Structure formats: C-alpha cells, structure tokens
C-alpha cells in the first residue's frame, strides 16, 4: 500500500454498492486529503452500476485505494493496525464487519442507522449521519479524542459465537427442564 510510518490510515470493508456508502467514503476522503483511505472488498465490476464502477476505477482522490478482496494476515493487520475503521453503510442486516473491527480493538466510525441500536452506543462507537459529521468524527478519532476501543471490544466479546452458543445452550436446558 506504500504507506509511511506517520500516515493516518482509515479503512473500510465491503462490497462496491451505494448502499454501503462508497460514495460518502470518497466524499469524506476528498475532504481529508492528509489521510489515507483504503477500501477492502470486491464486487464483479460488470454487475455494479456504472456510477459505482467509475468511482472505483478512477473517480476518486489519490488518497483512496481500492485494495480488492484480501484475507488472512494482511487483512487482519490492516484491521488492527489502521487508525480507524469507517463504515458509512446506509443499510445492514447485522454488521458483521463492524464486529470484526471491534474485535480487533479498532475505533469505529459508523453511519447512525437502526441496526446498531441496542448493541452499540457512543461508548463503543462514534456515529454520524452525513459527510460533514463523518469528517468531524474521524478528525476526533484520529486526534485520539475518543476512547471507544475497550468498550467496543467488550461488545464484540459479548456477541462472539462461543458466548452466543453458551447462552443458547442455557436457554435450551431451561426449556427442557
């Protein structure tokens, strides 16, 4: 990625769809030219709308990189080593990638959408609803003015497969009594 040690890096992971907020990701990057923005994920460019394809291929500033689909150590390193995880998705069913970021002790900046109600709050994540709000939130996170890492990690722990499975076993045993 040709990063320098003092680069501020914001990452995202998702498919190339407008509902994932790819357009706002780019608009935020345009307003923060001093920060590197890397989007992990891929979608066959022939099945996405022309506008999104243009954004990914060339209609984005130089501080944006579309890394494609990367897994394993490189992705895990990016998730835990970047300065923030920014997920401007307009609609989610669960937000699994958000849990991955939280489990990586990452500070997350999210669009304020209903799916996060009841399991995330301002102690575990930073929320905004538009481009100016995202820029402000990311500036605060990058300046270390937010401390959501530990609370976010505890949210991820509480929603781990092992924890949920244990709770289901307890419910099942109680029902069987």
What is each model feature region?
Residues 103, 107-110:
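Short hydrophobic beta-strand element within catalytic cores of glycosyltransferases
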Residues 69-70, 77-82:
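Short alpha-helical donor nucleotide-sugar binding micro-motif in glycosyltransferases
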Residues 146-173:
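A charged, aromatic-enriched C-terminal amphipathic alpha-helix characteristic of glycosyltransferases
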Residues 90:
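Aromatic "clamp/platform" in nucleotide-sugar-dependent glycosyltransferases that forms part
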Residues 50-70:
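Nucleotide-activated donor-binding/catalytic signature segment of Leloir-type glycosyltransferases, i.e.
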Residues 4-20, 26-30, 38:
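Conserved donor-binding/catalytic core segment of Leloir-type glycosyltransferases
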Residues 122-132, 140-145:
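Conserved acidic donor-binding segment of nucleotide-sugar-dependent glycosyltransferases
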């Amino acid at each position: 990625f040709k990063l320098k040690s003092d680069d501020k890096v914001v990452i995202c992971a998702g498919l190339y769809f407008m509902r994932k907020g790819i357009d706002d990701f780019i608009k935020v990057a345009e307003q923060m030219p001093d920060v590197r923005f890397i989007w992990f994920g891929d979608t066959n460019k022939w099945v996405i709308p022309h506008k999104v394809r243009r954004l990914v291929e060339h209609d984005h500033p130089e501080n944006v990189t579309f890394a494609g689909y990367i897994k394993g150590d490189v992705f895990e390193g990016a998730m835990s080593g970047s300065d923030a995880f920014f997920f401007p998705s307009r609609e989610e069913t669960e937000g699994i990638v958000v849990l991955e970021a939280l489990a990586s002790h990452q500070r997350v900046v999210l669009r304020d959408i209903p799916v996060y109600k009841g399991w995330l709050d301002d102690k575990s994540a930073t929320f905004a609803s538009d481009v100016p709000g995202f820029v402000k939130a990311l500036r605060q996170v990058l300046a270390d003015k937010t401390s959501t890492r530990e609370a976010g990690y505890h949210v991820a722990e509480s929603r781990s497969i092992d924890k949920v499975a244990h709770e289901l076993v307890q419910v099942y045993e109680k029902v069987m009594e």
